[in-house]
């Protein structure tokens, strides 16, 4: 009898485990979208819609994003578009070009080999994995749609936690246009939040900057990490995200788009143990650099990795290493890794 009870319990646990696994495998697909707050610059060149398979279409906010075009050695600021959403499972995307008929289209990076269909002035395609994309119509790369998709946030910080600096949907201003983050704090920008100021992570430790929000496109040098350690940045859109004199820094799924002079995307100066994972850089100077002594930061660099990322340099270089340093006492840049990069 005892043996029989044990076997019944065993089979019950096994069945529960199998059912539990099936529930995970066939979990419901999810979609998260956010409306742009009133007063933020939008672009009507595209209408962007997304839906779960055979579900209801959701129209996304299409933000105005500026990029730098060089023609005949001169710089011209052009107006492009940007839309953002998160999902799991499979989604259909419809991008309608509101300025005319679509003759040709591209969905970049081309390495993803995403099939699409053109019907009149609409391009449609399906996504099964989060991607950071450029949708281009009729060969125009300077008035394109930047479509940034991610996995849903696993945990959202508690806005009532005193260690959290929380910005919900809407436009937010900060004193002197700068948010200085103390040690031990988490800054959270919710989807639909736009911060009108730089985020400065300077001379601190154990800091996080998270969310699906935006540091406004008018803010130069949107994120600055300096002389700090144990810093984690994820999901934010900003013009730039520089790291100097720091160690143990992770920058994941951050999008950097700039349009002005010296608009480097993700510089690294005299820092160690820096990881860029799943980032997107479209910049008006170098997308990512590794330098020694420069701009007040001193020393070499060690263990810098960029992986699973997309680099688009409208000006200068996608990757730039060296050049700046201490010529009188040369420094070492070592263990630099670039893995699975689209350029």
Where are these regions (language model features)?
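Bacterial Sec-dependent N-terminal signal peptides
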Residues: 1-28, 210
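Beta-strand-enriched, solvent-exposed domains that form extended recognition/catalytic surfaces
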Residues: 28-159
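N-terminal domain-start segments of secreted/luminal proteins
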Residues: 34, 149-185, 193
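A structural detector for beta-sheet-dominated domains
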Residues: 51-53, 86-88, 96-98, 117, ...
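Extracellular beta-strand-rich solenoid/capping regions of secreted or surface-exposed proteins
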Residues: 123-127, 172-186, 194-210, 216-231, ...
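Short, recurring structural edge motifs at helix starts
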Residues: 172-176, 220, 263-266, 292-296, ...
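Right-handed parallel beta-helix
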Residues: 184-186, 191, 205-216, 229-239, ...
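Conserved mixed alpha/beta catalytic, RNA-binding, or beta-rich assembly cores of soluble enzyme
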Residues: 198, 266-267, 317, 323-325, ...
């Amino acid at each position: 009898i005892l043996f029989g009870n044990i076997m019944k319990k065993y089979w019950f646990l096994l069945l529960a485990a199998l059912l539990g696994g099936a529930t995970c495998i066939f979990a419901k697909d999810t979609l998260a979208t956010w409306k742009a707050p009133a007063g933020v610059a939008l672009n009507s060149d595209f209408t962007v819609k997304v839906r779960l398979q055979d579900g209801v279409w959701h129209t996304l906010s299409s933000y105005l994003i500026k990029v730098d075009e060089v023609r005949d050695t001169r710089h011209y600021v052009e107006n492009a578009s940007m839309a953002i959403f998160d999902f799991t499972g499979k989604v259909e995307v419809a991008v309608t070009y509101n300025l005319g008929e679509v003759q040709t289209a591209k969905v970049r990076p081309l390495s993803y080999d995403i099939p699409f269909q053109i019907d009149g002035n609409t391009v449609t395609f399906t996504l099964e994995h989060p991607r950071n994309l450029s949708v281009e119509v009729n060969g125009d790369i300077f008035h394109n749609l930047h479509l940034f998709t991610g996995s849903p946030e696993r945990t959202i910080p508690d806005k009532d936690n005193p260690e959290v600096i929380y910005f919900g949907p809407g436009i937010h201003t900060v004193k002197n246009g700068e948010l200085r983050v103390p040690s031990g704090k988490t800054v959270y920008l919710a989807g639909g939040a736009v911060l009108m100021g730089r985020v400065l992570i300077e001379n601190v430790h154990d800091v996080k900057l998270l969310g699906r929000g935006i540091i406004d496109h008018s803010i130069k040098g949107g994120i600055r990490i300096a002389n700090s350690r144990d810093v984690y940045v994820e999901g934010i859109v900003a013009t730039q995200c520089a790291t100097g004199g720091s160690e143990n820094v992770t920058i994941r799924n951050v999008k950097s788009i700039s349009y002005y002079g010296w608009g480097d995307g993700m510089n690294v100066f005299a820092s160690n143990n820096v990881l860029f994972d799943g980032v997107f850089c479209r910049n008006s100077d170098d997308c990512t650099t590794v330098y020694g002594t420069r701009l007040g930061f001193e020393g070499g660099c060690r263990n810098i990795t960029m992986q699973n990322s997309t680099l688009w340099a409208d000006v200068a270089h996608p990757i730039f290493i060296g050049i700046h340093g201490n010529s009188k006492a040369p420094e070492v840049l070592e263990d630099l890794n670039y893995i699975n990069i689209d350029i």
